[in-house]
């Protein structure tokens, strides 16, 4: 089914829907379901079994009436009596229920109705916005119509097999083209229903894959911030790092003031909070500064007193 194009599938669905509805409508409306031998004239009280046997002619019947093909009543049709008075059955038996269902022909009529609605759904799928949902409805209608059709055919066969007048002869009846039209309508309806459901499943899978890919794409772009925002965050993070706030070695050598000098010029707000530890630290820092300040002076004097470093003026 994947090898077929979607347009071919829709063409099969449309043509199949029209064919199934047409065949079933013709089958229900015609009288060529069954060919059998029977009496065409109306029953009378003086009739016996022998006279009726001699007057039997070939007839064709549908769902509601029987027509004669031979004899003096050729071409005459009469309504089918599904509940004859001389029939040997009780009203509470399964045969009576079968005859009642056969007389009502509810399943063939229901099949035609479902096929009609299925065809409307197929036609509406060409214009409706959410066409895949309409196609699913059409598939459900056609599958249900096929099931109703086959149930009606089974009931019809069972009713004919259970006819008391047909039991003594195995070859006393045969099925006509109307019956086969109904059978072909069942096959086509089931094929159309399966194709319609397959179209819906394929379309649903495509929409699901498309929505899944769009969702993944949106989530991927949501995780990645814009370039400017990332650059701004990166620059701000660099400015907030502790290493970025440290001074370079050159600035440390020439433009910084030792922390001990700063501590010498800072005063405590509360003189009562000065402890022995702070006094010792200040004395130690003061001694260190004296040593630090005296070292360059002595070094300068040694350089000045060195005779190699003296400048001599030529005479």
UniProtKB/Swiss-Prot annotation:
InterPro entries: CACNG_subunit, PMP22/EMP/MP20/Claudin, VDCC_gsu. GO terms for molecular function: channel regulator activity; voltage-gated calcium channel activity. The chain crosses the membrane at residues 8-28, 104-124, 135-155, 181-201. Pfam families: PMP22_Claudin. The modification Phosphoserine is found at residue 248. Regulates the trafficking and gating properties of AMPA-selective glutamate receptors (AMPARs). Promotes their targeting to the cell membrane and synapses and modulates their gating properties by slowing their rates of activation, deactivation and desensitization. Does not show subunit-specific AMPA receptor regulation and regulates all AMPAR subunits. Thought to stabilize the calcium channel in an inactivated (closed) state. This is Voltage-dependent calcium channel gamma-3 subunit. It comes from Bos taurus. The gene is CACNG3.
